[in-house]
Amino acid sequence: MAGDDSGPEEQPQPFNATKLEAAKKRKRSSSPTKGAKRVARSPSPSDIYKSRRSPSPVRKQKRPGQRARIGDSEREAIRQQQIERENEVAAVAAAQGIHNAVREHYNAVPQRGREWRKTDSKIKGLRSFNNWVKSTIIQKFSPNEDYTPGAQERGSRGEYQFAEGPDPSQEKGLLVLDIGCGKGGDLGKWQQAPQKVELYVGLDPADISIDQAKERYREMKTRGGGRGGRGRGGYNRQPARIFHGEFFTQDCFGDSIERIPIVREVGFDSSGGPGRFGGGGFDVVSMMFCLHYAFENEAKARTMLKNVSGALKKGGRLIGCIPNSHVISDKVEKFNAGVSAKAKAKEAGDSAEAEEKAEENAEDGEIEEGEAEETAHWGNEVYQVRFPGKTPTDGVFKPPFGWKYNFFLHEAVEEVPEYIVPWEAFRAIAEDYNLELQYQKPFNQIWETEKDDEVLGPLSERMNVRERGHGKLLVSDEEMEAASFYVGFCFYKV
């Protein structure tokens, strides 16, 4: 038994009748131990092993220096193992530091309110434009394939029901999982989705942001959700019921979301690796302005995709927006070309005209004399992008993970570390998790394509993206450049 300190028990000795002797008178001993009969000890396993093995030959004397050489190699191997362990610990600490920095940043962003964003914000045009793009993605890709437009107002016979409202048996609501929900800024957009939302689950690693999202949801419930009620032709209609919402603090890139009770209740497929996913229960997973944080390393990217694919039912959609890797690659390539041209001009002692031409090629990243190391950077008064280290000359980021840059957005983001999502690599990895690309467009192209849509065009006017009556765009050139840094997408679960 483990923990027993007693020695080995005495073993019974075999009986041998041939060795019997007459009993002898026992001599009294003055000492209790003197003359005591020694008990035979059972052979230990090591004794048995020694008795069975051949006697060791006489060890030959090693040549001088051989032992030292072996010792050096062993010490070097141990040293390398120690360095690897230290590097692993440092990498984990660094990753945790970045994760904490991002979380603390978004926790610290003040909740200024809708009126401030509409009136006092210096980037109100950009805010309105980005919100319109997110609404556009939700409007276009959130409904199920079997959804019939207008089902919320019609009964089973196609008759409008003002007093009773929609027949729940005839309409299935969406089950939405919002990863990186932040402060709940998209709750209103989901309430205005073409197909009504039945359940909304918001996840975010920033606990303060989750608290603010819960408060925003409570305010929406108090207002009745903002749909239905008194409107043209709907005076007798009951206010539309706001969807059921639940919110959780959760790192969706480092841990499985299966531990969340409502996720398990809706359905989560944890079957394993790429290509083996059946289906979860959610109709839509939304990831607005957050997926790029998962590309810090491959493990996080795959955990993120496993969570997304495990949560989505077959036919479900992953929608969202991320920084445009094509824009980043183009900017980096131009910057490096400008740096190279300037270095060559300086070495050759060319004229000031050559210097000026080289600087024009590097217009996206001004270089200051005396810098220890020139790194790619660009931007304007609204946003700034800066890489902390060297970047590929051709702008091709391989391997596709861990390419960090610092991003600044006026009034919103203060030099937060972000990661490039090389688009083709992302698309290929997503296919491993049964996610097939259906849509991908830069924000500026989304505007050009959808601005005259019969639904999305008027929506842009109501959201103050442009003036009423197909008026002028209320987004400055600097704001549009910042918006063009992003791309919207939709993947289908197959």
PLM regions: where:
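Ser/Thr-rich, low-complexity intrinsically disordered regulatory regions
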Residues: 1-102, 153-166, 230-232, 351-365
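Class I SAM-dependent methyltransferase Rossmann-like catalytic core
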Residues: 83-173
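C-terminal lobe and adjacent flexible extensions of AdoMet/dcAdoMet transferase-like proteins
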Residues: 85, 335, 339, 370, ...
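Conserved class I S-adenosyl-L-methionine
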Residues: 172-182, 201
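Class I SAM-dependent methyltransferase SAM/SAH-binding core
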Residues: 185-261
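A short SAM/SAH-binding and catalytic strip from SAM-dependent methyltransferases
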Residues: 267-299
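A short glycine-rich, Lys/Arg-flanked "PGG" loop and its adjoining helix->strand segment in the class I
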Residues: 275, 300-314
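Conserved beta-strand signature within the Rossmann-like core of class I S-adenosyl-L-methionine
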Residues: 314-323
